[in-house]
């Protein structure tokens, strides 16, 4: 039964990702060779190339001591609006084993880079509107007093409670001798009468080698980027700090193919009793360069 549920939820979550990639490929949009980092929670200062579209799928398999295991999954559609602005739309869903598979909501994210060139530290401003229900289990970030027991509420109960939030991040990132170092400070305000909540994420990553291969290849070491991230909650306005918060550390690996595909995997380990003991995250993405120009040309071609 477990394997059947898991296979069904994986098949469902992959469907939208595969369909979008197939439609986009049919439009003959060339792929852009890019080097994506392995982070799934933390952000660095790199934005999407202007006019490029990246379609992404991610999964989180989670274990729980107080409830059934779950599979949270989401699709992302990331577009480079300008050189300093990237916008992204999320669709979230989850399967809780022994209960149900449900759609949990959507998110609209925007990242703004105020400094055009590379600096010692590169800031990015992050703003997101989130409209999900309490059954959401993608764990895209940890905020406030989010703890493992929050995710044990049955889907039939949790899905009735709506969360509409504004999320803000200050991203400080630097590339140095092949390394990337990043720090994210998180502040979240529920649009109801709840206090501000806070969190953080830290990350460091580096390609396995900085030497480029003499020929095009898929398995060259420069296409593999290893890293680690750590993230957790910092309480809220009335009880700021580490008390009754959860924290995680996650080593990860990204494999960037010259064709435009990127694959990520990230085992995640809870650092205290309030955290999930183990999460397994993985994802795939495909980047289409010149997507905006292709769409414009399609519309121009239909003008009378």
What are these regions (language model features)?
Residues 1-3, 20, 60:
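Charged interaction patches that mediate protein-protein contacts
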Residues 1, 29-32:
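Glycine-centered signal
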Residues 11-27:
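Bacterial N-terminal signal peptides
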Residues 1-12:
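N-terminal secretory signal peptides that target proteins for export/translocation
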Residues 33-304:
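Transmembrane beta-barrel domains of Gram-negative outer membranes and organellar outer membranes
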């Amino acid at each position: 039964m477990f394997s059947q549920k898991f296979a069904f939820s994986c098949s469902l979550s992959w469907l939208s990702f595969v369909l979008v990639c197939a439609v986009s490929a049919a439009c003959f949009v060339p792929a852009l060779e890019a080097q994506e980092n392995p982070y799934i929670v933390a952000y660095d200062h790199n934005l999407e190339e202007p006019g490029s579209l990246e379609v992404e799928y991610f999964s989180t398999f989670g274990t729980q001591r107080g409830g059934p295991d779950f599979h949270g999954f989401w699709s992302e559609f990331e577009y480079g609006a300008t050189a300093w602005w990237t916008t992204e739309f999320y669709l979230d869903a989850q399967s809780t084993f022994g209960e149900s598979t449900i759609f949990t909501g959507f998110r609209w994210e925007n990242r703004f880079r105020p400094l055009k060139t590379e600096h010692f530290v590169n800031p990015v401003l992050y703003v997101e509107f989130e409209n999900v229900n309490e059954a959401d289990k993608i764990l895209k970030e940890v905020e406030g007093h989010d703890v493992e027991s929050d995710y044990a509420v049955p889907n039939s109960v949790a899905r009735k409670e709506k969360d509409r939030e504004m999320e803000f991040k200050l991203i400080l990132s630097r590339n140095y001798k092949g390394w990337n170092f990043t720090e994210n400070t998180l502040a979240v305000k529920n649009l109801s009468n709840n206090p501000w909540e806070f969190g953080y994420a830290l990350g460091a990553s580096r390609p396995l080698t900085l030497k480029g291969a003499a020929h095009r290849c898929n398995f060259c070491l420069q296409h593999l980027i290893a890293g680690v991230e750590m993230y957790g909650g910092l309480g809220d306005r009335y009880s700021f700090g580490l008390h009754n918060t959860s924290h995680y550390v996650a080593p990860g690996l990204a494999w960037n193919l010259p064709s435009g595909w990127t694959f990520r995997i990230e085992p995640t380990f809870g650092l205290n009793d309030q955290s999930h003991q183990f999460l397994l995250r993985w994802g795939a993405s495909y980047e289409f360069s010149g997507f905006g120009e292709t769409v414009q040309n399609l519309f121009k071609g239909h003008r009378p």
